[in-house]
C-alpha cells in the first residue's frame, strides 16, 4: 500500500494515483524498466505551501521470481517564504514472486531522506496474496528509523493490513494503519487508508 514493489509499468503507460484523496500522483513509464513519478498535494493553508516529490524507479534485475529496483528522488516543500526546500532521497526494493505472474509476492524496501545529521530511513516488508482475479490480501510492516543525531525523536513502527481489488487498468486498496510500540494510546487507534490507481496502457 505504501511501500513500493519491484514492478515497473510497460513502456508508454501513463498512470494516476490518489492516496486518501488528498495525495496525488502522476507517472509515465519511459521504458519497460524505468518510470518517472510526480507526487504532491493541492496547496495547503493561506500560504499555499505544498509538498512535492519527483522520483525515478529503475528495474536493475528481473528474474522470473526476483525483481530488484532502485529509486532516486528529490522531495520537499514548495511555496515557503524563504524559498522552495528540497532534499535528496534514495532507496531500493527487492520483490520475491510466488508465481510466474507475480500476482502473489513479498517485498523488502528501504528509502533514506538525505538530510545530513537529520537523515531518516523508511523501511519495511510487505506481502501480497492474490485470492482470485478480483481480490488480494495486503499486509505491511513499516518502520521509521533515524540515522542522524538530530532526528532521534522521529521513529516508529506501524502495521498496515488491507484488501486490494486488482484489475488490468485500475486497482483499489482499502486498509488501515496502526502504530505499534507507543507509550501512550493514540487518539485514533487506527488510521483508515484508501488508494486508487488508474493507468492508460499503450
Language-model-detected regions and their locations in the chain:
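Transmembrane beta-barrel domains of Gram-negative outer membranes and organellar outer membranes
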Residues: 1-115, 119-122, 128-202
